[in-house]
Amino acid sequence: MKKPLRQQNRQIISYIPRTEPAPPEHAIKMDSFRDVWMLRGKYVAFVLMGESFMRSPAFTVPESAQRWANQIRQEGEVTE
């Protein structure tokens, strides 16, 4: 008998982006990407939404962080 791939009644945890007034001063801007900053050895995207920045989870590659930023930006355009 095969096991089900995931637990049926388990809640799906989704990431709720943090909002910050600005990227931290110790973050290093990645020049080749629009929204990606290097923070403690990981890549984090900061997207300006209204008056504050939304912060992505930490990624190991900058392309992933930029992809997240693009997706957040698209979702923001849809809701406005």
Swiss-Prot record:
UniProt entry keywords in alphabetical sequence: Cell cycle, Cell division, DNA-binding
Cysteine-cysteine disulfides: none
InterPro entries reported for this sequence: CedA-like_sf, Cell_div_activator_CedA
Keyword Coiled coil appears in the UniProt entry: no
Record-level GO BP terms: cell division
Signal peptide range: none
Keyword Cell cycle: yes
Primary role: Activates the cell division inhibited by chromosomal DNA over-replication.
Family (UniProt): Belongs to the CedA family.
The name this protein goes by in its record: Cell division activator CedA
Record organism: Escherichia coli (strain SMS-3-5 / SECEC)
